[in-house]
Amino acid sequence: MASSFPALQFKVVARCSTTRARVTDIQLPHGLVESPVFMPVGTQASLKGVLPEQLDALGCKIMLNNTYHLGLKPGQEVLDTVGGAHRFQSWNKNILTDSGGFQMVSLLKLATITEDGVTFLSPRDGTPMLLTPEHSISLQNSIGSDIMMQLDDVVHTLTESKRMEEAMYRSIRWLDRCIQAHKRPETQNLFCIIQGGLDKRLREICCREMVKRNTPGIAVGGLSGGEEKHAFCETVYTCTSILPDNKPRYLMGVGYAEDLVVCVALGMDMFDCVYPTRTARFGNALTRKGVINLRNQKFRNDIGPLEEGCSCPCCKTELEGGWGITRAYFNSLVSKETVGANLMTIHNVHFQLQLMRDMRESIIKDEFPSFVKNFFHEWNHGDKSNYPSWAVDALRMVNIDLLA
């Protein structure tokens, strides 16, 4: 299946014959993105502690920027003057921006939502400000992101049903306003966002209504907010059962390794999360055998790499063209020197990107079920009793039995 829009061409390259996993090509204005793909989050037009050329060298083809933060600083006028966020941050690959609505509600006190938009108090001087669908799109047009998100009515997944239904229908109406306000469809893609909490009926209604609007891509939002994981997976499964096959599917805010593997199996293509970079700043390294905390003094004299066999520049030896950094060196740096956070972030982002590359390769070879089983075996050190029940149940929905 394929689809074509002025700023996005989409093609399914390969499918898993057992699950809903697939490999796709997403051609965007700043280059080709191959999915499944993980998108690192550069909140304020930078990945904390990492240079654009370092991120590029890791093979990253698309990153996130935050509309709310860029709207505050440097501000829309500066973005217009400099020619958008790509030039502002010296990043010549793709950018996806959120709408700013989530930050309004989650980060700011006394935010209120009406049909007009989100009213909040300015963090600068405390004066009331209103973010409307039109203003969100205007900001994202100034940012120049390759993919921009509609403003949606964001509520917690456990919100009572009447408010959840109101938010779902309002998100549909706000999408219509976003489409009307979008000035640059020839160079920027507007994605809709499926809402509805954990309510299957609301999710189904929202999927069908959003699909009618024919946006270049579709996101599933309102999850990964602390809800029970079985319900999370069932909601993802519900959405991928309905969403069209010929458009990219973006699951917002998901980035734990186990979640990525399961949700690729359930049929999602694109993912983002601050977790890999944020946890790096606390001294935590992501490996195929789980997360290791380099602050632990048992690593004080460990001269091995973060992960044996890892091809990131931190773990590769100097003879292999890397930096040959040891666990002992990380132990001496973490929480003390900014270079430690920089190096750990590079490793963790590489881990995420390599995980997605490995999944793509296994799907193309039609060996994805074996990959999934091997991943959980290694992640849990071969102990099936440690396999999370939510993952076992979710994968059974797509014909993988982890316990067999």
UniProtKB/Swiss-Prot annotation:
Binding site for substrate: D98, S99, G100, G101, F102, D152, Q195, G222
Cofactor: Zn(2+)
Gene Ontology MF annotations: metal ion binding; tRNA-guanosine(34) queuine transglycosylase activity
EC nos: 2.4.2.64
InterPro entries: TGT, TGT-like_sf, tRNA_ribo_trans-like
NCBIfam families given in the database record: Q_tRNA_tgt, tgt_general
Function: Catalytic subunit of the queuine tRNA-ribosyltransferase (TGT) that catalyzes the base-exchange of a guanine (G) residue with queuine (Q) at position 34 (anticodon wobble position) in tRNAs with GU(N) anticodons (tRNA-Asp, -Asn, -His and -Tyr), resulting in the hypermodified nucleoside queuosine (7-(((4,5-cis-dihydroxy-2-cyclopenten-1-yl)amino)methyl)-7-deazaguanosine). Catalysis occurs through a double-displacement mechanism. The nucleophile active site attacks the C1' of nucleotide 34 to detach the guanine base from the RNA, forming a covalent enzyme-RNA intermediate.
Name of protein: Queuine tRNA-ribosyltransferase catalytic subunit
Species per Swiss-Prot/TrEMBL record: Schizosaccharomyces pombe (strain 972 / ATCC 24843)
Lineage, top ranks: Eukaryota, Fungi, Dikarya, Ascomycota, Taphrinomycotina
